[in-house]
From Swiss-Prot:
Encoding gene, per UniProt annotation: mutM
Cofactor(s) of this protein: Zn(2+)
Oligomer status and interactors: Monomer.
Enzyme active site: P2, E3, K61, R270
Zinc finger region(s), FPG-type: 246-280
Protein name: Formamidopyrimidine-DNA glycosylase
Protein family membership: Belongs to the FPG family.
Length: 286
């Protein structure tokens, strides 16, 4: 599932190719693609027609297109395989094309939502005074947000009394960090994923946040992480941060710091990758 860097890459592409364009027509080709829009596909298409798209926004892994002069926005759920592509009008339809948005201009391109597994979709929502779709107003700011409060995060982290990887994936504490980048940041910080958060000092929290930001910015610089053809940017191009991963997916390979074989452990229906030497497991107290 796309994490913050991948979603931000898509957002930047939409800002370049879709922002400030007026919708001429919307074609909903599969009902599941608008299942979160409870009024249905016809209502979704009708309410978008004639509206001007504002600058795309993002919080964590959530992406939306505000509609200018309204208090509404189109929220994009990419799911496991959703893609927002900007394609020429005459480009052949993708096999799993679900929604087509045509624009009232002569640029010759349209926005397409393509989704092989149909877990994703588009939906229209009212926005809060801060401009967020109301259904995601509870989501915490992400670490690349200029208004992210490091001190408040530290206090919340200690109060949560959980383990550090669970905290990094908790959208009420910090948004946008998924399994891949949590493992990468923890490896860089030399912290075991099961370390309790109650004992974190301010300097340790600051160091961890620094690594989270560094790994996300590094991924952004190369278009994100793509393990298959399902994650692409708006031009259909894959990212290649997977070539630079230090922890995730490297079970049995030597740690890039100490050469100890990396390990993988099942974790919350996912996997955690770590170095048993650099990232010592916390002591178990009885």
């Amino acid at each position: 599932m796309p994490e913050l860097p991948e979603v931000e890459v898509v957002r930047r592409g939409l800002e370049r190719w879709v922002a400030h364009r007026t919708v001429a027509d919307v074609e909903v080709l599969h009902p599941r693609a608008v299942r979160r829009h409870t009024a249905g596909g016809e209502d979704f298409a009708h309410r978008l027609k004639g509206r001007r798209v504002g600058v795309p926004s993002r919080r964590g892994k959530y992406l939306w297109l505000p509609l200018e002069t309204t208090d509404t926005a189109v929220l994009a759920h990419l799911g496991m395989s959703g893609q927002l592509l900007v394609q020429p009008h005459d480009c052949a339809d993708e096999r799993h094309l679900r929604i087509r948005v045509r624009f009232a201009d002569a640029l010759g391109t349209e926005l397409r939502f393509v989704d092989q597994r149909t877990f994703g979709g588009l939906s229209l929502h009212d926005t809060t005074p801060d401009g967020l779709p109301d259904v995601i107003a509870h989501i915490a700011r992400d670490p690349l947000d200029p208004l992210f409060d490091d001190a408040a995060f530290h206090e919340a982290l200690r109060r949560k009394r959980t383990t550090v990887k669970r905290a990094l994936l908790d959208q009420s504490l910090i948004s946008g960090v998924g399994n891949i980048y949590a493992d990468e940041a923890l490896w860089r910080a030399r912290i075991h994923y099961e370390r309790p958060t109650a004992g974190f000092t301010r300097p340790r929290t600051a160091e961890l946040l620094g690594h989270v930001r560094d790994v996300m910015n590094a991924a952004l610089a190369v278009g994100g992480t793509s393990f298959d053809s399902l994650y692409v940017n708006v031009n259909g191009e894959s990212g290649y941060f997977d070539r630079s991963l230090d922890a995730y997916g490297r079970e049995g390979l030597p740690c890039r710091r100490c050469a100890t074989p990396m390990r993988r452990r099942p974790w919350m229906n996912r996997s955690s990758y770590f170095c048993p030497k650099c990232q010592r497991a916390p002591r178990v107290t009885v």
